Amino acid sequence: MNMKKATIAATAGIAVTAFAAPTIASASTVVVEAGDTLWGIAQSKGTTVDALKKANNLTSDKIVPGQKLQVTEVASEKTEKSVSATWLNVRSGAGVDNSIVTSLKGGTKVTVEAAESNGWNKISYGEGKTGYVNGKYLGDAVTSAPVAKQEVKQETTKQTAPAAETKTEVKQSTPAPTAPKAAETKTAPVVDTNATTHTVKSGDTIWALSVKYGASVQDLMSWNNLSSSSIYVGQKIAVKQSAAKTAAPKAEVKTEAPAVEKETSTPVVKENTNTTVKKEVTTQTQTNTTKAPAQAAKPAPAPAPAPTVNTNASTYTVKSGDSLSKIANTFGTSVSKIKALNNLTSDNLQVGTVLKVKGTVPTTNTNNNSNTTAPTTNTSNNNTSSNTSTPSKNTNTNTNQGSSNSASASALIAEAQKHLGKAYSWGGNGPTTFDCSGFTSYVFAKSGISLPRTSGAQYASTSRISESQAKPGDLVFFDYGSGIAHVGIYVGNGQMINAQDNGVKYDNIHGSGWGKYLVGFGRV
């Protein structure tokens, strides 16, 4: 009678357990063969490694050929969850050692097919595709599925050991604490993928932003006029093409000086973050590039008065916001010529100053001195010696000038070579780190020559020369598609020294991808 009661009790326990589970399990036996693993058997039988170990009282993953394993196939209750991370990698197996199949965007709905003991879940997504993800990155978790699996497997062992009913009750409550883990993941921030701009935070990279917003690295660099992948904390990055269009300053400058393309192609690409630059041209460009997208369209009517400038005039009165490069572009001349016409020793201007913008630059004092000394020699000698000595002096003067220019270029290149191997930093002015135009400005300054701070402004302030005319010490410019964005110091034989992502180094201007971006050469 006692045995009958025990049997009834066991049966009742099984019935209660089966009722609590979402589905009914069926048991089978598998014989381990050479090369088999618990994970492989679990996959082929629609169960989990944890379930196999519990059903067979295994304390490790080790199995041997010929070993018989009790397998319980469980049709789990499928649970719908959503990806709580920004992007979640789907792998071919339950662990980071397995290959990535794809990545799911935050908020994507998935169905959990099974839960592994290591916290990974087998999921289905899309149209019947399956894979494995880390369960802590799934929100809205329902824990009934793993409870059902454990209960049903104990029900299988209960047929041979009624006392196992007590174990079932204990295990039924064991998975419950896993629920808060899923709930915690709900607090993970979900990125607004509809945003058009992103403010850079610590740890951000161009690649991470491209993944986060579904844009390619090339697009992000193009939309933001970046010549390298370097970004800095606090920088506002356009992550949609629409933001790039409204933020670009090109149209605003173009209407202001429609006849000159140089100013149009002078966006501050890498250097517009340098707050220490005092050149007015840099300040003006920075102001344009930091406007909010909603305001960028407003300045369009402002340049309307630009056509009132008489570009045929020989003088110009400096106005607020003017710079030498801007004035030079407006009148189709160069910064160096305006400085020579007005005896300027720096690029600084004052509002109200009247500048000569047309005319002939007077010859240098060196030539005049040479000419005046010739008659003096003639006076002190007879005609024969006079004729002989005069060309001798002229020849010496020209030779000295050539040597001086050569020496100046050699000194400039020697200064550039001192910094080979130094690190690149966006906005770097030296002497420990540089960006491209910071490097050229620093090197030329060491030779007593003042250059504008940005590559675009340097392009506008130099005289155009062909590659066949280029000599060591000239500047070489590059355009990635949005205006002048890079500058280096030409050293001859198709080589330049420049500051780029890999630091200060030599580069072939026609090799390693540089050739297709080469714009031309400029002489200071």
UniProtKB/Swiss-Prot annotation:
Keywords: Hydrolase, Protease, Repeat, Signal, Thiol protease. Residues 78-142 form the SH3b domain. Residues 1-27 form the signal peptide. It comes from the Bacteria. Residues 174-188, 272-299, 362-408 have a biased composition (Low complexity). GO terms for molecular function: cysteine-type peptidase activity. Its EC number is 3.4.-.-. Residues 28-71, 196-239, 314-357 form the LysM domain. InterPro entries: LysM_dom, LysM_dom_sf, NLP_P60_dom, Papain-like_cys_pep_sf, Peptidase_C40, SH3-like_bac-type. PROSITE patterns: LYSM, NLPC_P60, SH3B. CDD domains: LysM. Belongs to the peptidase C40 family. This major extracellular protein may be involved in the invasion of non-professional phagocytic cells by Listeria. LysM domains are thought to be involved in peptidoglycan binding. This is Probable endopeptidase p60. It comes from Listeria welshimeri.
